[in-house]
Amino acid sequence: MTVKTRFAPSPTGFLHVGGARTALYSWLYARANQGEFVLRIEDTDLERSTPEACAAILEGMEWLNLNWDEGPYYQTKRFDRYNEIIAQMLEQGTAYKCYCSRERIETMREEQAAKGEQQKYDGCCRDKAPRDTDEPFVVRFKNPTEGSVVFDDHVRGRIEFANSTLDDLIIARTEGTPTYNFCVVVDDWDMGITCVVRGEDHINNTPRQINILKALGAPVPEYAHVSMILGDDGAKLSKRHGAVGVMQYRDDGYLPEALLNYLVRLGWSHGDQEVFSIDEMKQFFNLDDINKAASAFNTDKLIWLNQHYIKESDPEYVASHLEWHMADQNIDTSNGPKLSEVVSALSERAKTLKELAASSRYFFEDFAEFDETAAKKHLRGVALEPLTLFQTKLAGLNDWTLEAIHQAIEDTATELEVGMGKVGMPLRVAVTGAGMSPAVDLTIFLVGKARTEQRISKAIEFVANRINS
């Protein structure tokens, strides 16, 4: 049997990290078993579902490279199918029309609560014949009243619900639209889903859905209910913990591999290994290894992983993601070094692509002024001689190579009988405007000869003005 999983978000907001982790687990289980992964948009909540949210979900999935084999399917385009099944169930007696008013239902629940009883529908219309009237009605599933529903959850083990505790679920509203719990069942059946991976908040839906599947004569899939994600304070993850949409992590400068690596470890482990390539995730991932305890989100760990991926990934690949941030920060990269060369130069220290983009600005455009602290320390009178001598040597360079630039810096220090730092630091501030950069010879090489000459002239003028002021 081919393994077939699905990710079925509701388009009422962005794709958040909890949803992204569920999608990843479902995707990995399919890929690890040479199966298929389906994307389904559960948009039956017509009031809250929006095209913008749907677009955000698709964008997030594409950015994470969680490709799907089928879909996206939209529940709102399948209403005819749901209504067809509801009509069959009414005819077969596995569902019935309920004419109870909202007022009667509310009174019933109040009385049950007063007696300390479980609040559920009392079956008033369960065995009554349909009325030949225009009275409004809902359609309820005739849930079994005896026995129990048992399923073996990949994460939580054996779970059992007594049928006596389950309600006769509404499967069609008064206006005729099918309900979420019913649509899910029909979709999983029609799409051949063999394993449902979802959040633990769906556990109570599972016995109802299993009973409907059995009533339809449909196969029951396997289930894996993953725990929620907590903030680092132990509370449910929310916006105050920085719980944001997946694309916000893109905007903040994270690589998709870093976020995926972090999310896969947020509840799953393989020995003591922390860093996983996508291929390793596919190789080692197993639903049975997911921890049933809730996991706490740790931004510091995510940053550490992101820094690792920026440093260790192919510079060309990192540059392809960096392009977005350069454009976002209005940095024109058409007049400067190759972006992959900038990545190679700066990746050692960068924690995020956003940070890397900001720190690379001087490679592509001139700066208005020198950093005050760096200039005060390194653009003093003693810097005038090394700056002037190096500029002379720079003008005589015919081959613009890293080796030639390094030799010019070394020759300047030798002729002036000073340490390399006495030449390198004034040059660094002159060329970048700041006190930190990659190796000064590499920095000068990437900035280019013309820009370097202009900036050294600017620095010489700055030092001369300080001396004369």
UniProtKB/Swiss-Prot annotation:
Entry's Gene Ontology BP terms: glutamyl-tRNA aminoacylation
Molecular-function GO terms, alphabetical: ATP binding; glutamate-tRNA ligase activity; tRNA binding; zinc ion binding
Reaction catalysis annotation: tRNA(Glu) + L-glutamate + ATP = L-glutamyl-tRNA(Glu) + AMP + diphosphate
UniProt-listed Enzyme Commission number(s): 6.1.1.17
One Pfam family recorded for the sequence: tRNA-synt_1c
Subunit-structure text: Monomer.
Binding sites annotated in the UniProt record for Zn(2+): 98, 100, 125, 127
Motif ('HIGH' region): 9-19
GO cellular component: cytosol
Localisation per UniProt entry: Cytoplasm
Protein name: Glutamate--tRNA ligase
Protein family: Belongs to the class-I aminoacyl-tRNA synthetase family. Glutamate--tRNA ligase type 1 subfamily.
Positions that bind ATP: 239
Function: Catalyzes the attachment of glutamate to tRNA(Glu) in a two-step reaction: glutamate is first activated by ATP to form Glu-AMP and then transferred to the acceptor end of tRNA(Glu).
Motif ('KMSKS' region): 236-240
Keywords for the protein's UniProt record, in alphabetical order: Aminoacyl-tRNA synthetase, ATP-binding, Cytoplasm, Ligase, Metal-binding, Nucleotide-binding, Protein biosynthesis, Zinc
Organism superkingdom: Bacteria
UniProt remark on cofactor binding: Binds 1 zinc ion per subunit.
Enzyme class: ligase
Cofactor(s), by name: Zn(2+)
